[in-house]
Amino acid sequence: MSNWDTKFLKKGYTFDDVLLIPAESHVLPNEVDLKTKLADNLTLNIPIITAAMDTVTGSKMAIAIARAGGLGVIHKNMSITEQAEEVRKVKRSENGVIIDPFFLTPEHKVSEAEELMQRYRISGVPIVETLANRKLVGIITNRDMRFISNYNAPISEHMTSEHLVTAAVGTDLETAERILHEHRIEKLPLVDNSGRLSGLITIKDIEKVIEFPHAAKDEFGRLLVAAAVGVTSDTFERAEALFEAGADAIVIDTAHGHSAGVLRKIAEIRAHFPNRTLIAGNIATAEGARALYDAGVDVVKVGIGPGSICTTRVVAGVGVPQVTAIYDAAAVAREYGKTIIADGGIKYSGDIVKALAAGGNAVMLGSMFAGTDEAPGETEIYQGRKFKTYRGMGSIAAMKKGSSDRYFQGSVNEANKLVPEGIEGRVAYKGAASDIVFQMLGGIRSGMGYVGAGDIQELHENAQFVEMSGAGLIESHPHDVQITNEAPNYSVH
């Protein structure tokens, strides 16, 4: 039988329990480097990841956060085909060079070209002699189709085939931009020595490179994206489809990552995908992190029950206050030379700084993005104000939609037999995700400047915390005043 001292191991701290101590600094906020390397093929320019929740991250959110320099994790409350399509939308939204452009043949109907353009929001399609030889013979664009009345006509009757402007494989963006401007065209097909279509550069993608200089991209200039899978019978099929669609990582998403069945499944996934990036969680202890790394995970997700819509801690009585959980898991991550993501409990940009200072390499956010334009949640008006729906993946509605396996209830068929660990609610409408990111980054840079940390590694090494009393927390917030105009980075919860 354990004695009192071993039963109650230690005190746990969360964000409202601590503050970072300001220190001598030679770092200005605008000099701070926020780049973070999570895995060999996964380097972000900002340490922000949007949660794999069905009211937070679809393709629109993933595109927005990747353009800002972060990473979106596409939720799994949809069919395998639908989720893979969401990944493709992100990967095709922006390219340095499109290495696998869509193409049709002269025999295809104009209607097929139109359907392809509308589906993927592109303005033109290269035309090849045959699907087998891929020899470029023309291109059809929106301009070619503008006055067509017979959409059953073959593309050969309307495509541009003479005086095609092309470039060789390996042409850089600067040269491509010059060619596009010189010929007043929007698309530049890349061909090999045999005239075979091997890539495509568009003026739109070049403009996006200029507009979003800090975007998080893969080696081909495409936006980074991850996607969630569960521990179910379709795990391998789903993971295969997601990687095939271009996912840079998969997130094995469960409520309790330190579970024998989960660890066995992760080891099988690692054996099946030996060279892919695997993120898994959630855990809240050093032992949990160690078990996941031993199973083959690259990045561990930390947090059991800290989220605003999560009820695990009160329904199950289980969890570890988030700052302590991050700190303990980070110590193990350093042993393995790997990384962690702090998932949940963050309300303000200052909490992000605390999460990083405690050892996090990035943070995962749900509620802070749920109210944005890009979030999939429905918009509603309540008492004259605009809100968006937000629900935990452990809520009844989300579990019925497909997330019940996350809470080890995948075999439950009746809604009234589900035991939820989350709630459904609403959050205030916030506008564009880019505006939220701007304010977040300003707060993170400011915090790192206060403690003299030029990058996240220095923050790990040099930051020190002070425990805060309840009175200290009251003092930390605006007090003894009635707020008349809310600041863009602060609201009363």
From Swiss-Prot:
Gene Ontology molecular functions: IMP dehydrogenase activity; metal ion binding; nucleotide binding
Binding site for NAD(+): 253, 303-305
Quaternary structure note: Homotetramer.
GO BP term (any one): GTP biosynthetic process
SUPFAM superfamilies according to UniProt: CBS-domain pair (SSF54631), Inosine monophosphate dehydrogenase (IMPDH) (SSF51412)
EC number(s) per entry: 1.1.1.205
Keyword Repeat (UniProt): yes
Domain CBS: 97-155, 159-219
Protein name: Inosine-5'-monophosphate dehydrogenase
HAMAP family noted in UniProt: IMPDH
Record organism: Streptococcus pyogenes serotype M3 (strain ATCC BAA-595 / MGAS315)
Cofactors demanded by this protein: K(+)
Residues annotated as binding IMP: 308, 343-345, 366-367, 390-394, 421
Principal EC category: oxidoreductase
Keyword Oxidoreductase in record: yes
InterPro entries: Aldolase_TIM (IPR013785), CBS_dom (IPR000644), CBS_dom_sf (IPR046342), IMP_DH (IPR005990), IMP_DH/GMP_Rdtase_CS (IPR015875), IMP_DH_GMPRt (IPR001093)
Regulation: Mycophenolic acid (MPA) is a non-competitive inhibitor that prevents formation of the closed enzyme conformation by binding to the same site as the amobile flap. In contrast, mizoribine monophosphate (MZP) is a competitive inhibitor that induces the closed conformation. MPA is a potent inhibitor of mammalian IMPDHs but a poor inhibitor of the bacterial enzymes. MZP is a more potent inhibitor of bacterial IMPDH.
PANTHER family: INOSINE-5'-MONOPHOSPHATE DEHYDROGENASE, INOSINE-5-MONOPHOSPHATE DEHYDROGENASE RELATED
NCBIfam families: IMP_dehydrog
Amino acids binding K(+): 305, 307, 310, 475-477
Record pathway: Purine metabolism; XMP biosynthesis via de novo pathway; XMP from IMP: step 1/1
